[in-house]
Each structure stands twice: as structure tokens, then as C-alpha cells.
Curated annotation (Swiss-Prot):
Cofactor: Mg(2+)
Subunit record text: Monomer.
Domain UmuC: 4-184
Compartment(s): Cytoplasm
Protein name: DNA polymerase IV 2
One GO molecular-function entry: damaged DNA binding
Protein family membership: Belongs to the DNA polymerase type-Y family.
Gene Ontology biological-process annotations: DNA-templated DNA replication; error-prone translesion synthesis; SOS response
Organism: Rhizobium meliloti (strain 1021)
SUPFAM superfamilies linked to this entry: DNA/RNA polymerases (SSF56672), Lesion bypass DNA polymerase (Y-family), little finger domain (SSF100879)
Length: 354
């Protein structure tokens, strides 16, 4: 049985800003820009109480929270703090799989400290993060990656939650599927239409049913409904692409609706690019039709895509020619590949595509 920890920094970007500027502490803070095209990169817990969250348009966030304070992002600082945190992880285990600047999986079944309890390691790490960075982290401890991820959400912020092998299956059965890692809003809505609202409902469906309705994701849903996840923690995972996709609630037939659906996907991918200091030269558009067949269209440029506006322009070049669409569009996705890193000197604004 493996011992897995999922560490998730609490409102990471916003917490760094509040740490470095005492005047922001205790106030609703959004990292991003307040302009009409701006997007919230991160929100403090004070802002989240008003319904503000990451990837929300700035104008919407300001409407929800008139007292919201916007601060420009400092991704060079966030990356530096992330490196501090990664250094702490490395003192306990070589099996660290970073998911982003602010979260990671650790396999501590065998660890450098010779500690038998993963909970003890998680508490040590949380304490060191607090002492060395003056930030808080939440941790989930369990026997696989899925449950460790679910556990870290249970006591946020600044908490620890453990899911043991004895309690794992019951925990999953009681959990709403919309809270499952890997189940997005569109998938949760589809599950609801199929009468699946809890882990118990999901477990009651056989593998053939889940494969019929969810394709390649079917086996994943089948096993996590039973508290089983065999994925290993993969250290130094080399990312070959950055992508985002979404399923429409109703099939899309017109270009304007497709454009509107593509905008948040472009923003999500660009947000990751800015946060990680990565850029890509090849952009791929994925279109899944109503009959589940799909096509992809790609464009490669000489220099890495340098802005969200440029990314939007390329997306338009790929999207427009498929209209008038021969059939309804079920899903759109956008991916950047041919990746490379950039230095910290140029950080364009996180913004919504025009």
C-alpha cells in the first residue's frame, strides 16, 4: 500500500501578495488587472467569500465584490517561492510530481527521514512551509493520488485530512461527483442527467455503461468510484503540451457560440503559460462532433506565441474555416506544443481574448 501526500498551497498567488504587503492582509484581493479584458489569476479567501474565483473576468469579480483590490501578478516571485517549497519536498522523497507552482504529489512510502507515518511527514512539511515562506498549505494523505487530492480539499485553508484504506470506499461513495477530481462541470451535468450524483451512484454503473457514455474516461470513473487509482507519482514529469477542453451542454452550430466557448480555454492555457514561464510554437484546435467523431487543426509558427492576443488570432484562423459546420459541435479543445521556457523579464498581461 502506497503512502501519498497531496500538498496544495492556500490561495497561493494572492497569499504571496498579502505576505509581502501587510496593507492587503485581511482584505479581498485579486491577482490580475481590473480592465475590461482582465481576468482574475487568483483570489484571496476574503475575496472568495463573495464568489470571486480564478479565471473569472475582472468586471464580474468587481461586480461581485466592489471592495476587491486588484494587484498585478509577479510570476517571477511566485516561481521563486515555488522553488523554495520544492526544495523542502526534496528533503523527504525523490518521488515528487509537481502539478503546478502551488501543488504537488509526494510518494513517501519510502522516505529519507525513515518516518513511518505519512501524516507526520505532511505535518512536518506544512510546518516548514509556514516557517520558511510565511505561507500556509493544506495537505491530503491517502493510499492513492485520487484520494490524496480529494483529502487536501477537505480542510482548506491550512489543514490536514487523512483518508485511510478502511474509510476510502465509504468516503468516495458519499462524495458528490461534481467534487471529484477529473469531473468538470459539463461531465457532472451529464452524470446528473444519467442519474449519477454521488460516488455511490457512480459505483452502481457497470464499466460498459460508463465507457458507452464517457468513452476513454469510463474506466477511470469506474475505478475511482471504488476508491482505486493505480497511477504512480511521476517525478520530473516532462510536459510536452498544455491544453484545455470543454464539452458544451448543447451541441453548437454557429461560429459566434464556438468563439465564446473557446475564449475561456485560451485564457486557461495562457494562464498556465504565464505562471510556468512556458511558451509554445504549435497550436492545435480539437473539434469533437455530436456523433463523437473528431478533427484537429494545427498551426506552427517560427517564434513562440508571445501573447494571449496572438494565441486568439491563431485560434480564429483554425476555427473559422470549419464553418458552416457540417454537424453540431460537442466539444472544443485547444493545445499548445513545441514548448520552451522563457525568462522572467517579459510578463504580458493575463487577459481575455478579444
Amino acid at each position: 500500500m502506497r503512502k501519498i501526500i497531496h500538498i496544495d498551497m492556500d490561495a497561493f498567488y494572492a497569499s504571496v501578495e498579502q505576505r509581502d504587503n501587510p496593507e492587503l492582509r485581511g482584505k479581498p484581493v485579486a491577482v490580475g488587472y481590473p480592465e475590461a479584458r482582465g481576468v482574475v489569476a487568483a483570489a484571496s479567501y476574503e475575496a472568495r467569500k463573495f464568489g470571486v474565483h480564478s479565471a473569472m473576468p475582472s468586471v464580474t469579480a468587481k461586480r461581485k465584490c466592489p471592495e476587491l483590490i486588484f494587484v498585478p501578478h509577479r510570476f517571477d516571485v511566485y516561481r521563486a517561492v515555488s522553488r523554495q517549497i520544492q526544495a523542502i519536498f526534496a528533503e523527504y522523497t525523490p518521488l515528487v510530481e509537481p502539478l503546478s507552482l502551488d501543488e504537488a504529489y509526494l510518494d513517501v512510502t519510502e522516505n529519507f527521514r525513515g518516518l513511518k507515518l505519512a501524516t507526520e511527514i505532511a505535518e512536518e512539511i506544512r510546518g516548514r512551509i509556514r516557517a520558511e515562506t510565511h505561507l500556509t498549505a493544506s495537505a491530503g494523505v491517502s493510499y492513492n493520488k485520487f484520494l490524496a487530492k480529494m483529502a487536501s480539499d477537505q480542510r482548506k485553508p491550512d489543514g490536514l485530512f487523512v483518508i485511510t484504506p478502511k474509510h476510502g470506499p465509504d468516503f468516495v461513495q458519499a462524495l458528490p461527483v461534481k467534487k471529484f477530481h477529473g469531473v468538470g462541470p459539463a461531465t457532472a451535468e451529464k452524470m446528473k442527467r444519467l442519474g449519477i450524483e454521488t460516488g455511490a451512484d457512480l459505483k452502481s454503473r457497470d464499466l460498459a455503461f460508463l465507457q458507452q457514455h464517457f468513452g476513454k474516461s469510463g474506466p477511470y470513473f469506474y475505478w475511482i468510484a471504488r476508491g482505486i487509482d493505480e497511477r504512480k507519482v511521476k517525478p520530473d514529469r516532462i510536459r510536452k503540451s498544455i491544453g484545455a477542453e470543454d464539452t458544451f451542454r448543447e451541441d453548437v452550430h454557429d461560429l459566434e457560440t464556438a468563439r465564446a466557448g473557446l475564449k475561456p480555454l485560451i485564457d486557461k492555457v495562457w494562464h498556465y503559460c504565464e505562471a510556468s514561464g512556458i511558451r509554445g510554437k504549435t497550436m492545435t484546435l480539437k473539434v469533437k462532433w455530436a456523433d463523437f467523431t473528431q478533427i484537429t487543426r494545427s498551426k506552427t509558427i517560427v517564434a513562440p506565441i508571445a501573447s494571449v492576443a496572438e494565441m486568439s488570432e491563431i485560434a480564429e484562423l483554425l476555427l473559422s474555416p470549419i464553418f458552416p459546420a457540417p454537424k453540431g459541435i460537442r466539444l472544443l479543445g485547444v493545445t499548445l506544443s513545441s514548448l520552451d521556457t522563457v525568462d522572467d523579464r517579459s510578463e504580458p498581461q493575463l487577459a481575455l481574448a478579444l
